[in-house]
């Protein structure tokens, strides 16, 4: 996944800087050059990258820093802040409210994945207790209604539209919204015709649909492959209708995702979701601070809980969250997380653990890593329930290991390798022991409980050392004003 490559490049640059014996101007320049190269390859605008590098050098004036200052931490924090600045539009997204029907209108270019994204958006909210419905007001593209109907049926979401009998998109939108309001749907999503920037007639149609239904929110859906051109496209749509938020699609397959995100931010339009694949659950809430935290290998604890809630069946969530908060990590949980990794890619569950973002799927070796997960899962398929659910690896005696190897058609040393991987992951997940993880995804509760003692448990020793140990961590949290801000830096506080 391209985002993982960008994150891997940036986190490696910071790691190399941290490993240097002495932090001098040469080391700082090498670090910034690597980060600059990675951002330019992601199609981030040259001026933004240049300004970021200049700002970091101003903040991190090595000659003026008094002895005793932690230069590594100051550099890391400056990189974090500047990346957030590039991606932050400085304007919060509109918040939908339960209890009253909200109408959301989707607009976008042809081929951006708008119709599929409508269903993903509805599905995301349906899993969180909303009652969504879909209205197809796209009468321009042949097959638009059939596509929406197929997607909605698969996701078990009610839909409204007409393939042949009605050709007026305004009437379809108005009738559909009224129908679903009567059925007490609290999230009504209207899909409009996809269009090109220069198509004046279709832009006029979009305005008419908007004026007729007066949506609470207009979402612009944009393909990440257009990169820096996102600025012009987003501006064109903003001039026609009141775009309140943006969803960037196809972030899994293009090198220009960083450029698209940064240029959308320049239009002051908040990005609220990113599409990371074709499947219904390959759809992530976009929040700048957790996103940057993950790119830098700092993790995203709030995203971890949200991902668990997305992937694990509702009735199993409390049990899994409780096990993780107790530090229990079994082979069965590892099996399930490998399944999640295969579904979600490298920016899935493991990337949300601090200091662990790129280890499971190294850059350029994604297919090799996926094949390894499948081999491990085949071995675990030959295990008993007792073996899968035990937290004591010693029960896997030599005779059991030989039985597992025979049953899975693998070699004994491959089973041993899988068990070593399990021990390593169990050690990392044990860092979550003692954290009060909310069972219903209330991340404000997690933020309130995230004091310096708890934070030190989940930070890798190397990162804790970089910020000056427990004393440095406490001072940093004090300087940043609150535990909530600290959670922001290390990936928390990400809501819907």
From Swiss-Prot:
Function: Component of the signal recognition particle (SRP) complex, a ribonucleoprotein complex that mediates the cotranslational targeting of secretory and membrane proteins to the endoplasmic reticulum (ER). As part of the SRP complex, associates with the SRP receptor (SR) component SRPRA to target secretory proteins to the endoplasmic reticulum membrane. Binds to the signal sequence of presecretory proteins when they emerge from the ribosomes. Displays basal GTPase activity, and stimulates reciprocal GTPase activation of the SR subunit SRPRA.
Complexes and interactors: Component of a signal recognition particle (SRP) complex that consists of a 7SL RNA molecule of 300 nucleotides and six protein subunits: SRP72, SRP68, SRP54, SRP19, SRP14 and SRP9.
The protein's enzyme class: hydrolase
GO molecular function: 7S RNA binding; ATP hydrolysis activity; endoplasmic reticulum signal peptide binding; GTP binding; GTPase activity
Binding site for GTP: 108-115, 191-195, 249-252
PANTHER family linked: SIGNAL RECOGNITION PARTICLE 54K PROTEIN SRP54 (PTHR11564), SIGNAL RECOGNITION PARTICLE SUBUNIT SRP54 1 (PTHR11564:SF29)
Domain notes: The NG domain, also named G domain, is a special guanosine triphosphatase (GTPase) domain, which binds GTP and forms a guanosine 5'-triphosphate (GTP)-dependent complex with a homologous NG domain in the SRP receptor subunit SRPRA. The two NG domains undergo cooperative rearrangements upon their assembly, which culminate in the reciprocal activation of the GTPase activity of one another. SRP receptor compaction upon binding with cargo-loaded SRP and GTPase rearrangement drive SRP-mediated cotranslational protein translocation into the ER. The M domain binds the 7SL RNA in presence of SRP19 and binds the signal sequence of presecretory proteins.
EC identifiers of the protein: 3.6.5.4
Sequence segments annotated as region (M-domain): 297-496
GO biological process: SRP-dependent cotranslational protein targeting to membrane, translocation
Source species: Solanum lycopersicum (Tomato)
Similarity annotation: Belongs to the GTP-binding SRP family. SRP54 subfamily.
Superkingdom, natural source: Eukaryota
GO CC field: cytosol; endoplasmic reticulum; signal recognition particle, endoplasmic reticulum targeting
Protein name: Signal recognition particle subunit SRP54 1
